[in-house]
Amino acid sequence: MNLNATLIGQLIAFAIFVAFCMKFVWPPIIKAIEERQRSIANALASAEAARKEQADTKALVEQEITEAKMQAQQIIDLANKRRNEILEEVKVEAEATKAKIIEQGYAEVEAERKRVQEELRVKVASLAIAGAEKIVGRTVDEAANSDIIDKLVAEL
C-alpha cells in the first residue's frame, strides 16, 4: 500500500506545484500573453490606420495630379491663345506695312510718271516749235515762244 501513500504524496506535491505555479508562474505568463495580444491588436490597428491613411493620401495625390494636369492644360491653352493673338497681330501689322509700302510705291510711280509726262510735254512743245520754225522759216521771239509752249503744254 505504499502505492497509495506515494500517490497521495505525489498528489499533494502536485497540488503544491500547481498552487505555486498559479500564484507565481501563471500571472507573468498570462500578463505577457495579454500584453502580446494587445501589442498585436495595436499593430493591426496601426496597420489598418496606415493602410487607410495611405489610401486617403493616394486619393489626395491623384486628385492633386488631376488638378495639376488641368492647370497645365489651361496654361497650355492660354499660351496657345496668346500665341494665336500675337500671330494675328503680327499678320495685321505686316498687312498694314505691306499696304503702306505698296501705297508709297504707287505714289512714287505716279510722281515719276507726272514728272516724265511734264518733261515730255515740254520737249514735245519745244520740238513742235522747232518744227514750226523750220516750216515757217523764221524765228519766233522768245516771249511768243514761251506763250506758245505754255498753251501747248496746257492742251496736252
From Swiss-Prot:
Q: Matching Pfam families, A to Z?
A: ATP-synt_B
Secretion signal span: none
Q: Which GO terms describe its molecular function?
A: proton-transporting ATP synthase activity, rotational mechanism; proton-transporting ATPase activity, rotational mechanism
Q: Which UniProt keywords apply?
A: ATP synthesis, Cell inner membrane, Cell membrane, CF(0), Hydrogen ion transport, Ion transport, Membrane, Transmembrane, Transmembrane helix, Transport
Ubl conjugation in keyword set: no
Flavoprotein among the record's keywords? no
**Coiled-coil intervals, chain numbering:** none
Q: Which family does it belong to?
A: Belongs to the ATPase B chain family.
Q: What does this protein do?
A: F(1)F(0) ATP synthase produces ATP from ADP in the presence of a proton or sodium gradient. F-type ATPases consist of two structural domains, F(1) containing the extramembraneous catalytic core and F(0) containing the membrane proton channel, linked together by a central stalk and a peripheral stalk. During catalysis, ATP synthesis in the catalytic domain of F(1) is coupled via a rotary mechanism of the central stalk subunits to proton translocation. Component of the F(0) channel, it forms part of the peripheral stalk, linking F(1) to F(0).
Q: What is this protein called?
A: ATP synthase subunit b
* Native source organism of the sequence: Pasteurella multocida (strain Pm70)
